[in-house]
Amino acid sequence: MELRQRQTQSLYRYRRVLEGPQGAELQMDGRRILAFCSNDYLGLANHPATRAAFMQGVREYGVGSGAAHLVTGHSRAHHTLEEALAAFVGRPRVLLFSTGYSANLGVISALIGRQDAVFEDRLNHASLLDGGLLAGARFKRYRHRDYQSLEAALTATKARRRLVVTDGVFSMDGALAPLPDLAAVADRFDAWLMVDDAHGLGVLGEEGRGSVAHFGLGMAQAPILVGTLGKALGTFGAFVAGEEALIETLIQQARTYIYTTAPPSAVAVATLASLRLVETESWRRDKLTRLIAQFRQGAAQLGLQLVDSPTPIQPLLVGDAGAAVKLSERLLAQGILVTAIRPPTVPEGSARLRITLTAAHSEAQVARLLESLVQVL
């Protein structure tokens, strides 16, 4: 699509320049803005303990890793974090990746090839869809959150290996994947189930162990687990968790791991501190749950059309891309930042305001958001 066409269809993307740290309020364009579009779900990106750990990591390791993990970039800090994350999600091994995007591409391409097939939810994150397309395997998309559609697709395949891929929490609507049903279907057809838990880790399940734990499942049902560190954990990077053989396979074959400079060790030190906060400060999840309930109850009373989501992601469906952009602009004029999500990120005709809540927000701030929505709609 040409740039001019994007502009006329209200699909043009812009960057905003922040002038300070993440938080419920942001410094932007010379003024304070109340933001409801961050993925910093637990409010840890600017936590004093995380910041102090990062600075300690800089003092110990410097600011850059200098090389890929397989050369001289893998530090004791990286290794310690991998072990801590493995214990947290209840898996034998974890492998750190620089980003969630590279983790998903690396896993899928390392595990399947031309004689295989990958089955993906139609609304999976772009990194999962790209991973499936680039792997060279037969690529099938099943209907959103529909395990029977997946079952029909698996019935028709004669592929050597079968990989089922889903988000744990879908990033644009906040809905949970039906993991127990997907796991049962995958098991029946001898397929691997891969869950990208970018938006569930830290938020769902006991002690924030994610969407797989939320459903009472484990490695036997979902052998491949991907998590990101830049959302609820408030830092940067990603990881893949699973059995010993999976991790060793990725070390040998995942090109996005082999040929990428390792993240700074200081980030690993900061993430370890953040992980301890996730484990010990359950009040953050409790508060987030209360704020979600407050927002949904208020929205229902106002007649707002929300997606059915129990997560911090609370999209307000608009439909038309231009209308969504105008609503976002009206909110910004009132000092509230909510991003308009438009095609191709979401299907045509389903543009929305992607409202996200965090533990850093207050009840008064959520009430202000509801009041502003009434005024702009």
Swiss-Prot record:
Pathway: Cofactor biosynthesis; biotin biosynthesis. Substrate binds at R13, H125, T345. Pyridoxal 5'-phosphate binds at G100, Y101, S171, H199, T228. It catalyses: 6-carboxyhexanoyl-[ACP] + L-alanine + H(+) = (8S)-8-amino-7-oxononanoate + holo-[ACP] + CO2. GO terms for molecular function: 8-amino-7-oxononanoate synthase activity; pyridoxal phosphate binding. PROSITE patterns: AA_TRANSFER_CLASS_2. It is an enzyme of class 2 (transferase). Its EC number is 2.3.1.47. Belongs to the class-II pyridoxal-phosphate-dependent aminotransferase family. BioF subfamily. PANTHER family: 8-AMINO-7-OXONONANOATE SYNTHASE, CLASS II AMINOTRANSFERASE/8-AMINO-7-OXONONANOATE SYNTHASE. Catalyzes the decarboxylative condensation of pimeloyl-[acyl-carrier protein] and L-alanine to produce 8-amino-7-oxononanoate (AON), [acyl-carrier protein], and carbon dioxide. This is 8-amino-7-oxononanoate synthase.
